[in-house]
Swiss-Prot record:
GO BP term, example: mRNA processing
Name the record gives this protein: Ribonuclease 3
Catalytic machinery residues: D49, E121
GO cellular component, as recorded: cytoplasm
Pfam family, one: Ribonucleas_3_3
Disulfide bridges in this chain: none
Other facts: The protein in strain DMS 938 / 37b4 has 5 other sequence differences. In Rhodobacter species, 23S rRNA is further processed to 16S and 14S rRNA species in vivo, probably by RNase III.
Cofactor entry: Mg(2+)
Keyword Plastid appears in the UniProt entry: no
Subunit and partners: Homodimer.
Catalytic activity: Endonucleolytic cleavage to 5'-phosphomonoester
Domain RNase III: 7-132
Function description: Digests double-stranded RNA. Involved in the processing of ribosomal RNA precursors and of some mRNAs. Complements an E.coli disruption mutant, but the E.coli enzyme does not cleave R.capsulatus rRNA precursor, showing substrate recognition is different. Probably also processes some mRNAs, and tRNAs when they are encoded in the rRNA operon. Probably processes pre-crRNA and tracrRNA of type II CRISPR loci if present in the organism.
C-alpha cells in the first residue's frame, strides 16, 4: 500500500519502517472508527501488552541480578502501566496519527492517556508482526531507555511513600482535598491539596483525581525530604 506522508513521518519518529504498513494502520485505528471492513486496534493492543511485558521483564531481570521479585515487580509495573505507555506515545507524537471516530475526536481523544496507551501497545504489536520479537524488543528498549534508567524513582508510589513518612513520625495518614475542577467535560483538570496533620501542604493539578493526588503527594514528599 502507498504510505501517506503523515504515516511515513510517524515511522521515522518511531524508528521502524514497515514492510507491511497495514499493520501500522490497524494499530492506529481506534474502535470508535473500526468497522467490518476497517479492523480496529483492540486485538493488537492485547498482543502488544504481552510483547511489552516480556521485553521489560527480561530487561529488568538482567539489569539487576541482585534484585528480589519484590523489588522487580514495582519497577515492572511502573514501566508498563497505561500512563507510561501514554507518555512514550506523546514522545513520538502518536496522537497526531491516531485514527478516531468523530465523537472521540471531538472529546479530545488524541490527548487521552487511555487511548494513547492502548495505541502504543498496538504499535508495538504491529512492529512484532512486521519484523519479529527481536526488532520489537529493541524498539521498546530504545523508546523506554530513559524511563528504565530512572525506574526506581518512578516505581515509588508517592501516596504510599508519603503515608509511610507520616506514620514513621507518629502522624495520621495524609488528607486529600479537592480544591476545584476546571476545563471542559472532555478534558477536566482537578486541583487537589494534600495536607499533613503537622500542617505541611502542597497542591497539584492533573486530568484525573488520582494523578493530581499522586502529583501533590510527590511534591510534598520531595519538599519534606529536602528539609524545606
Amino acid at each position: 500500500m502507498k504510505v501517506a506522508a503523515d504515516l511515513s513521518a510517524f515511522m521515522d519518529r518511531l524508528g521502524h519502517r514497515f514492510t507491511t504498513p497495514e499493520h501500522l494502520v490497524r494499530a492506529l485505528t481506534h474502535s470508535s472508527l473500526g468497522s467490518a471492513t476497517r479492523p480496529d486496534n483492540q486485538r493488537l493492543e492485547f498482543l502488544g501488552d504481552r510483547v511489552l511485558g516480556l521485553s521489560m521483564a527480561e530487561a529488568l531481570f538482567h539489569a539487576d541480578g541482585r534484585a528480589s521479585e519484590g523489588q522487580l515487580a514495582p519497577r515492572f509495573n511502573a514501566l508498563v502501566r497505561k500512563e507510561t505507555c501514554a507518555a512514550v506515545a506523546r514522545d513520538i507524537d502518536l496522537g497526531a496519527v491516531l485514527k478516531l471516530g468523530r465523537s472521540e475526536m471531538m472529546s479530545g481523544g488524541r490527548r487521552k492517556d487511555a487511548l494513547l496507551g492502548d495505541a502504543m501497545e498496538a504499535v508495538i504489536a504491529a512492529v512484532y508482526l512486521d519484523a519479529g520479537f527481536e526488532v520489537a524488543r529493541a524498539l521498546v528498549l530504545r523508546l523506554w531507555a530513559a524511563r528504565i534508567q530512572s525506574v526506581d524513582n518512578d516505581a515509588r508510589d508517592p501516596k504510599t511513600a508519603l503515608q509511610e513518612w507520616a506514620q514513621a513520625r507518629g502522624l495520621p495518614p495524609p488528607r486529600y482535598e479537592t480544591l476545584g475542577r476546571d476545563g471542559p467535560d472532555h478534558a477536566p483538570q482537578f486541583r487537589i491539596a494534600v495536607v499533613l496533620a503537622s500542617g505541611e501542604t502542597e497542591e497539584a493539578q492533573a486530568g484525573s483525581k488520582r494523578n493530581a493526588e499522586q502529583a501533590a503527594a510527590k511534591a510534598l514528599l520531595e519538599r519534606l525530604e529536602r528539609g524545606a
